[in-house]
Amino acid sequence: MSILNTTEIMELIPNRYPILFMDYVDELEPGKSIVATKNVTINEEFFQGHFPGNPVMPGVLIIESLAQAASILILKSEEFAGKTAYLGAINGAKFRQIVRPGDVLKLHVEMIKKKRNMGVVETFAMVGDKKVCQAELTFIVGATDKKDK
């Protein structure tokens, strides 16, 4: 059961196809944690070139998936509602396993620090029971230009 579907996700963050890397939110505790899902399919545009005959989800797009989940967590906090979360830093990123078409990527994010217009989160992505990626992400929250939504 999902807490937020794709339409509801797009009401919170500005990302759209082909750069929206989240299908739904499974769990959400505003200001604390979020778990979201990305179903990785062979139809993803990036598989055309990464790599033909050996499709692998680029690690930077796993980080982007985690960043999008983190943005929702941050923007569901009362003080940041209606704003945009911009990725400011990536620390300690580690990639532990290849992600391929057919994998279900579970995106886990936990808020570790929130101060003024900044937030720091610990993230990791799982496929089944295997951790495929982890990173600490820092966000800066700013105004949103609503005319493009």
Curated annotation (Swiss-Prot):
GO annotation, biological process: fatty acid biosynthetic process; lipid A biosynthetic process
Swiss-Prot/TrEMBL keywords: Cytoplasm, Lipid A biosynthesis, Lipid biosynthesis, Lipid metabolism, Lyase
Recorded GO MF terms: (3R)-hydroxyacyl-[acyl-carrier-protein] dehydratase activity
Membrane-spanning ranges: none
UniProt xrefs under InterPro entries: FabA_FabZ (IPR013114), FabZ (IPR010084), HotDog_dom_sf (IPR029069)
Annotated EC: 4.2.1.59
Keyword Heme among UniProt keywords: no
Active site: H50
CDD domains, alphabetized: FabZ
Catalyzed reaction equations: a (3R)-hydroxyacyl-[ACP] = a (2E)-enoyl-[ACP] + H2O
Compartments reported by the entry: Cytoplasm
GO cellular component, one term: membrane
NCBIfam families in the record: fabZ, PRK00006.1
General function of this protein: Involved in unsaturated fatty acids biosynthesis. Catalyzes the dehydration of short chain beta-hydroxyacyl-ACPs and long chain saturated and unsaturated beta-hydroxyacyl-ACPs.
Family label: Belongs to the thioester dehydratase family. FabZ subfamily.
Protein name, entry field: 3-hydroxyacyl-[acyl-carrier-protein] dehydratase FabZ
Gene name of this polypeptide: fabZ
